[in-house]
């Protein structure tokens, strides 16, 4: 795995900011980076047809291991591997067995990335856990685009659904197999504020 990581020629979590977001910022584009936490490729394919009004270029990204949020999402925003984050920013790293949230420093990691690549772009960071938060964000979207070069949005519903699938008998019944899980994802997306 270590050798494979050293010589990969495809995009991984920690490459996204450098290879995809940074070039857009350098071209003066205003960027909304929307991250669906715990979102699988088959779920993406299920909702993709709902987005035909948009010009979408699909570029696959391979996740680092482990894929747990604290590693994968922090790597995405920092533009570096978790071991590098822990070494460079020990105050922002939370050990796996710690009780507190492992993603409290995502805005700091985004700012640190921008500082490392010598960008003075303004950015905003939003974590969406409920419909009213999504509606509020949408109401402010035009203003955010005017004010910031980069707007980062983390949508947590899929992650909450995934956890509920293992913890709740009712959700297990609704998403009893992979096809049902994709269907539930699609239904949520169609009726969500972000669709």
Model-inferred region functions:
Residues 1-195:
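Feature captures the catalytic ectodomains and active-site-proximal regions of enzymes
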């Amino acid at each position: 795995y270590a050798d494979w990581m050293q010589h990969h020629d495809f995009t991984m979590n920690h490459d996204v900011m450098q290879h995809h977001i940074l070039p857009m910022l350098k071209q003066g584009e205003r960027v909304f980076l929307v991250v669906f936490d715990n979102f699988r490729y088959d779920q993406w394919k299920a909702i993709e047809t709902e987005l035909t009004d948009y010009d979408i270029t699909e570029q696959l990204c391979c996740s680092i291991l482990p894929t747990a949020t604290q590693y994968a999402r922090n790597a995405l925003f920092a533009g570096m591997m978790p071991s590098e984050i822990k070494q460079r920013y020990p105050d922002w790293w939370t050990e796996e067995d710690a009780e507190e949230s492992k993603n409290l420093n995502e805005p700091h990691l985004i700012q640190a990335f921008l500082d490392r690549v010598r960008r003075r772009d303004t950015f905003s960071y939003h974590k969406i856990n409920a419909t009213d938060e999504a509606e509020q964000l949408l109401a402010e979207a035009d203003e955010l685009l005017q004010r910031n070069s980069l707007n980062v949005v983390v949508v947590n519903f899929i992650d909450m659904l995934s956890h509920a699938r293992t913890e709740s008998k009712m959700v297990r019944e609704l998403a009893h197999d992979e096809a049902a899980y994709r269907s539930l994802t699609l239904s949520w997306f169609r009726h969500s504020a972000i669709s």
